[in-house]
Design a protein with these regions (language model features):
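N-terminal secretory targeting modules
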Residues: 1-227, 237-240, 258, 431-436
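Conserved SGNH/GDSL esterase-like catalytic core that processes O-acyl groups on lipids
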Residues: 58, 79-80, 103, 109-112, ...
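Catalytic His-Asp segment of secreted/periplasmic serine-dependent ester chemistry enzymes
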Residues: 282, 314-316, 351-436
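A cross-domain feature marking catalytic cores of carbohydrate-active enzymes
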Residues: 310, 349-350
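Surface-exposed amphipathic alpha-helices with a cationic face
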Residues: 331-339
Length: 436
């Protein structure tokens, strides 16, 4: 073989390697699932076309193991009702067995549009059977999650979806999100593809197993993921009305001129703290922000910008953190995690809680010290001043009466709207390291 022939042979082999590598890696995405939409699905509808990208349209963190569910919900169908922030031409879901002690076996999973808000009835012609790696059955080990294959479904923005799962055997404690502020449903037996909703006679205030819904879209540029506590969780928002502050933010991003076309993903857990993990079975704590940042925020599909709304529980919940610098150091660490993924971080000031049963003047001083550092511009890339937006001008330690839900800690629906309106949407664009 001559030298020129040898070079030609090597070039040909290199081209083959490139082609084979391309064939292997197309359709296999990283944890954020950016390429999964190109894979084939054996569900009721074909996977969406390849032009577009995956973006999360809804999310809810796994909070704890649901009490009194030692055997799970075997031989029962769970129909979760969730609300989209943006639409798309295809969809996929993520199920979590984070707090399970046994494998979770799901033999039937479906996705449909709801015929009416908060209703278990599926809209005509929208029921889709879901598969996982081309199988109708998925087994999720304890502590793990599974993302379904893509199905073609025209998903509208600001619409309710029905995600139904059936498990035939005991699975151990159920991974759940307790403060959904949304009615979901349970039925006896395998009713996952039942469209009328009549079998779903048991109502539930929880989301179970389901932690994310993504859509395939070419109209949405990315996602804003919010890491927060009960204020972001919307624990005092009107049930079934989608009036959390993140819902109002999603509405602004959809409708306002020149707004970035982002979805909004809610990563709020009631009682959540920056520094301290909560107990396994507590519905009011969850893993700390530092512990769950990667799982609940950074790994969501299409995230471009992170908004952080937390820190107050570190001050008012035992063990109370008396050193504001410790809280700020934790917030800075959250920023570092996001910057490692080239994500921008907008941070919120800590809101007033005067009049709440946990209020003490010395604790409010700590809150103000944290806020001073946040406002200095040396913690986050940008700041949204939730404190200024919600406080009573006559008594800045308290919420404005029109924005107070009544417990003097959590906002009302009007307060949640004021939070969303306080955020300058231009701050959500781009990325830049925080100054130190």
């Amino acid at each position: 073989v001559t030298r020129n022939m040898g070079y030609a042979l090597l070039a040909g082999l290199a081209a083959i390697v490139v082609l084979v590598s391309t064939a292997v890696f197309i359709g296999v995405g990283s944890e954020d699932g950016s390429l999964d939409g190109l894979t084939q699905s054996t569900g009721d509808s074909a996977a969406p076309a390849s032009s577009g990208n995956w973006v999360g349209t809804w999310s809810a963190p796994a909070v704890a193991a649901e009490p009194n569910t030692r055997d799970g919900y075997h031989r029962m169908s769970i129909r979760n009702v969730v609300h989209t922030s943006v639409g798309g031409s295809g969809a996929r879901i993520t199920l979590s067995n984070l707090y399970g002690t046994k494998p979770l076996v799901v033999t039937h999973a479906t996705l449909a549009l709801a015929a009416a808000p908060s209703n278990p009835t599926a809209a005509t012609g929208t029921m889709r059977r879901l598969t996982f790696n081309n199988s109708r059955t998925v087994t999720i080990p304890p502590g793990r999650k599974a993302t379904s294959d893509a199905v073609r479904l025209n998903v509208p923005h600001a619409a309710d979806l029905l995600v139904t799962t059936y498990s035939p055997r005991p699975s151990g404690p159920v991974t759940y999100h307790p403060y959904a502020r949304q009615t979901s449903y349970v039925a006896q037996g395998d009713k996952a593809d039942e469209t009328s909703g009549t079998a779903f006679t048991q109502q539930s205030p929880y989301w179970r197993y389901l932690t994310a819904v993504d859509v395939w879209t070419h109209q949405t540029q990315g996602a804003v993921a919010v890491l927060g506590d009960s204020i972001t969780d919307g624990i005092t928002s009107s049930p079934g009305a989608n009036r959390r502050w993140t819902d109002f933010l999603a509405e602004r991003l959809r409708t306002e001129r020149n707004a970035p076309r982002y979805s909004v993903l809610n990563g709020g857990i009631s009682g959540n703290r920056v520094l301290v993990d909560g107990p396994r079975y507590s519905p009011n704590n969850g893993p700390s922000g530092l512990t769950r940042m990667q799982r609940d925020v950074l790994s969501r599909a299409g995230v471009r910008t992170v908004v952080v709304e937390m820190g107050l529980n570190d001050i008012i919940k035992p063990p109370r953190q008396n050193n504001p610098d410790r809280i700020v150091d934790g917030l800075r660490q959250l920023v570092k995690y996001a910057h490692a993924r080239n994500m921008r971080v907008v941070g919120g000031t800590l809101t007033p809680f005067g009049g709440h049963r946990g209020y003490e003047r010395r604790l409010d001083v700590i809150r103000q010290r944290v806020n001073e550092q946040i406002r200095s511009g040396k913690v986050y890339d940008s700041v949204v001043d939730f404190d200024a937006a919600l406080r009573d001008p006559a008594d800045p330690s308290r919420l404005r009466p029109a924005y107070d839900s009544g417990d003097h800690l959590h906002p009302s629906d009007n307060g949640f709207r004021a939070m969303a309106e306080a955020l300058d949407l231009k701050l959500l664009k781009g990325s830049s390291p925080a100054r130190t």
